[in-house]
Amino acid sequence: LEEREPEPKGELDYTNPYTLLVAVALSAQATDIGVNRATKGLFKVVATPQEMLNLGEDKLKQHIKTIGLFNTKAKNVIKAAQMLVDNFDGLVPKNREDLEKLNGVGRKTANVVLNMAFRQPTIAVDTHLFRVSNRTKMAPGKTPLAVELKLEKKIPKEFSLHAHHWLILHGRYICKARKPSCPICPVNDLCQFKGKTKLHN
């Protein structure tokens, strides 16, 4: 996976740690393409928590109304912005515990921000990574947390920074849910997916 993508990048558009936090929070049950479309205009007028508060919830909703659950997400983004201003000097925290105190921010969102904004070797288990880990038997688990903890133990230190992106992109474009592209998979020989031989058409 490293050979194919030495410096993997996430597919959400952002300009700084705060706009990344907002984009990731908006991406729950939405596509990155849809989020990028919505934040294109938003991030031209908002780059900090204070600017988000100045914009206000109603105008924020206008920017993100094409995204699922936009009413709830708008409320959470505004509340999180207020917490950042009140408790963190308007800066995005660099640790999971404080990030998870923010409205609308769970472990997965916190891990994405820590990894992408602050280059910490965290693993954010989304649906793609969860599927890849279970399908290949690399780190099978019944919950995202179980998969995350197994991957943390298994992944060598030198790969830990980029592992989460490699696996997500692999799940999104190769090891897809319905029709995995097993014949072109770079790790086909290492995979324990029993159904893969049937898919060589």
Task: Give residue ranges: language-model regions.
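Catalytic cores of DNA base-excision repair glycosylases
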Residues: 2-201
